[in-house]
Swiss-Prot record:
This is tRNA/tmRNA (uracil-C(5))-methyltransferase. PROSITE patterns: SAM_MT_RNA_M5U, TRMA_1. The lineage of its organism: Bacteria, Pseudomonadati, Campylobacterota, Epsilonproteobacteria, Campylobacterales. The active site is at C331, E365. Pfam families: tRNA_U5-meth_tr (PF05958).
Length: 375
């Protein structure tokens, strides 16, 4: 990676390797980790070597310059956890990279916008829609709104101002994204404080990998931890109906909007924890949130799960064992390994993929497809 801060900024921990070297290091590490479960070839989804992140956050650093003038810089940590001032980042998308110096100049030249600013968040899309969140240690007044609106117009971006107990949305709080997945366009609105996959190119390939390895079914899909519908919406093309659950209110709001954007009517989204949903499926207790949904109308043959780093709990692992097909996307190989110890008692691994979402870091994501063992 051609970066002025490579090997200094602590964001890229595998700085001593080329892209292929760091990828091979992670591949071999994970093959060894999962060798007790399978010896099949892993599918490998590579990242671009640079400019792959459509989401980024930087601190703002102030210092005195010539004539005692306050100078603003973006900042990260170095490997000793000291402040490292930066003026660019090669991990972020070209659009964010291009915007960074323009934005800091505009902020620098206006005390109303720069005073007590301590962080900036960027959320971009492949459609060049851009949302910038400015985070302050001060109350934001009407004068700030007027100044920020000028920057919105000049830089063709959307701005949100945040401070303690304040969230000022100047235009709207989401960006529009179009993903071409298996030669079909899908439309998404990504919210400022919602979860999105930061590496758009790898995200598309992750979804395509799932679709390519999922047969068309006349039955239904159950999804846990659906987020904003990133996988749900494309996967709905493979099933009669989809029932998807998510605990986050923000994510459910996004999922419903995204479903509407794609004119899909075969998905029902429920704001409910995975644990409560299992109780509902097993008829342990009734839930008001399911009053308009008859679970007996569903004939599930596949479960899709994309859990947080903590992985599955005992309840969801036991639920998954009842399905013919399990699709498991994991952001933590340690908890995936733990979960597979149970899931492989009833299912066999058919496909295994590694997704290099975060190049030059130790992190790698995984995808596993399992089929029920025949009696």
């Amino acid at each position: 990676m051609n970066c002025n801060y490579f090997g200094i900024c602590a964001s890229c921990t595998l700085f001593d390797k080329t892209y292929e070297e760091q990828l091979n290091y992670k591949i071999q590490r994970e093959k060894e980790r999962f060798s007790n479960f399978t010896n099949i070839d892993f599918d490998i989804i590579k990242s671009n070597e640079s400019n792959f992140r459509n989401r980024a956050e930087f601190r703002i650093w102030w210092e005195k310059g010539e004539n005692n003038k306050e100078i603003l810089s973006y900042a990260m940590n170095d490997f000793k956890k000291n402040i490292l001032k930066i003026n660019s980042c090669e991990m972020v998308s070209f659009h964010i990279k291009e915007l960074m110096p323009k934005l800091i100049d505009e902020l620098q030249n206006d005390l109303e916008l720069s005073f007590k600013l301590f962080a900036v968040e960027f959320l971009g899309s492949s459609t060049k829609d851009m949302l910038v969140t400015l985070i302050y240690h001060k109350k934001l007044e009407e004068s700030w709104i007027q100044k920020a609106k000028e920057i919105e117009k000049k830089l063709n971006i959307k701005i949100i101002g945040r401070s303690k107990k304040q969230r000022l949305v100047l235009t709207n709080d989401y960006i529009n994204e179009t993903l071409n997945i298996s030669n079909q366009n899908f439309f998404f609105a990504y919210e400022e404080n919602g979860f999105t996959q930061p590496n758009t190119n790898v995200n598309v390939q992750m979804i395509e990998w799932v679709l390519e390895n999922t047969k068309n079914s006349s039955k239904d899909l159950c999804e846990l931890y659906c987020g904003g519908g990133n996988f749900t919406i494309p996967l709905s093309t493979k099933f009669r109906k989809v029932l998807a659950t998510e605990i986050s209110k923000t994510s459910i709001k996004s999922a419903l909007r995204n479903c509407s954007l794609n004119k899909i009517e075969s998905i029902s989204f429920i704001r409910m924890s995975a644990e409560d949903f299992v109780q509902a499926l097993n008829k342990v207790r009734a839930f008001n949130r399911l009053k308009d949904i008859n679970l007996d109308d569903y004939e599930f043959d596949t479960i899709f799960m994309d859990p947080p780093r903590s992985g599955l709990d005992d309840t969801t692992r036991n639920l998954a064992k009842d399905f013919e097909n399990i699709i498991y996307i994991s952001c933590n190989p340690e908890t995936l390994h733990r979960d597979l110890e149970e899931l492989t008692k009833t299912h066999e691994i058919e496909k295994f993929a590694l997704f290099d979402q975060f190049a030059f870091t130790n992190h790698i994501e995984s995808g596993v497809i399992l089929r029920k063992l025949k009696d």
